[in-house]
Amino acid sequence: MKEIKPAILFFIVFTILCGGVYPAVVTSIAHAVFPKQAKGSFITDKSGREIGSALIGQPFSDARYFWPRPSATTDFGYNPMTSGGSNSGPTNPDFLKTVGDRVKSLHDTGITGNIPADLVEASASGLDPHITPEAAKVQVPRVAKARGMTMEELKKLVDARTEDRQLGFLGEQRVNVLELNLELDKLSR
């Protein structure tokens, strides 16, 4: 009994500290220092209505828009409640069929040549809001034709919306698809 009292007390104290105090302090600091990010990095329209998050991919399938990476969520696309990659290896027959179907689908829309991997493979979370600048640029002819815009205008827009590596060395250059499409809508008006 002598040894169990400190163990129970230790359990109670650390449950309160780690399960209550620490999360409350970190959440308070996040709301004070990074208020937009702490609330989900929501993007709003002119009227203030939330139309998406800069952190979660959004479904776009209209030819007038740039398309994101495929979603790995199966019940409905880009569902953050069921995110996660397929964990299928590069030689898995199901994975190869899925990628082959996606490549064919993109070729059917007029995309020719090499297709960047991020247009046919879901990200690890299945919710990635970004594509590579190359993935955006191979879509330029389709979007230009659908919107009646020049390819030069769209290439400039993609270049302007390309984000650099974080801290200059982390990750790769990327384009947030939702933000790119919102800019596209502003230009088309």
Swiss-Prot record:
Task: Write out the annotated subcellular location.
Answer: Cell inner membrane
- Topology relative to the membrane: Single-pass membrane protein
User: Where are its TM segments located?
Assistant: 6-26
Q: Which UniProt keywords apply?
A: ATP-binding, Cell inner membrane, Cell membrane, Ion transport, Membrane, Nucleotide-binding, Potassium, Potassium transport, Transmembrane, Transmembrane helix, Transport
Q: Would you say which domain of life the source belongs to?
A: Bacteria
Show the GO cellular component annotation of the record.
Answer: plasma membrane
The protein's job, in short, is: Part of the high-affinity ATP-driven potassium transport (or Kdp) system, which catalyzes the hydrolysis of ATP coupled with the electrogenic transport of potassium into the cytoplasm. This subunit acts as a catalytic chaperone that increases the ATP-binding affinity of the ATP-hydrolyzing subunit KdpB by the formation of a transient KdpB/KdpC/ATP ternary complex.
Protein name as catalogued: Potassium-transporting ATPase KdpC subunit
- Native organism: Geotalea uraniireducens (strain Rf4)
Upper classification of the organism: Bacteria, Pseudomonadati, Thermodesulfobacteriota, Desulfuromonadia, Geobacterales
